[in-house]
Amino acid sequence: MRIILLGPPGAGKGTQSERIVERYRVPQLSTGDMLRAAVAAETPVGLEAKAIMESGGLVSDAIVVGIVADRIEEADAKNGFILDGFPRTVEQAKALDAMLAQKGIALDAVVEFVVDETALVGRIAKRAEETAARGQPVRKDDTPEVFKTRLDAYRKQTAPLSDYYAGTGLLRKIDGMKPIDVVTGDVTALLEGFRETASS
């Protein structure tokens, strides 16, 4: 079970990812977590990343792909993994494809959560209101203004991945506007279909 999750911020990827991890016992690979772990473990790629970050630079796609390559070799990822938050660009997707091909690993699917952006902004605004009403501080990225900026960035940078993966035949779309449990049911049905195909 090797899958990539796509979708704009607020689409519910995090929630669905947690449920996939729980059901299928495969790790969710977050590039941020992997980067920190590689730096802490002082792996060759981690040391390279550390030097770049300490000088204020951005870690290159090659380094991130190297970190993903190391991580998927670990025992808990042998039966599969979920990539969430990577790749973010078509260039990263191509680099990831090349690395996986080198290892003889194939992705099972790229699952895109399709959502209504206007409704998403409304959902975020409501969440911010409810948080404030409880007297709790509202996260900076939970305000409609910041959220719209994040959506714009997603649209420009990451949305082209949908076309890229559609071209590979891996893309599967899920309606992310349905209730959470219904979305989970749709994701499970999709993934069970892949498991049956793999075992037949």
Curated annotation (Swiss-Prot):
Keywords: ATP-binding, Cytoplasm, Kinase, Nucleotide biosynthesis, Nucleotide-binding, Transferase. It comes from the Bacteria. GO terms for cellular component: cytoplasm. Transmembrane segments: none annotated. GO terms for molecular function: adenylate kinase activity; ATP binding. It holds the Pfam family ADK. Belongs to the adenylate kinase family. This is Adenylate kinase. It comes from Methylorubrum extorquens (strain CM4 / NCIMB 13688) (Methylobacterium extorquens).
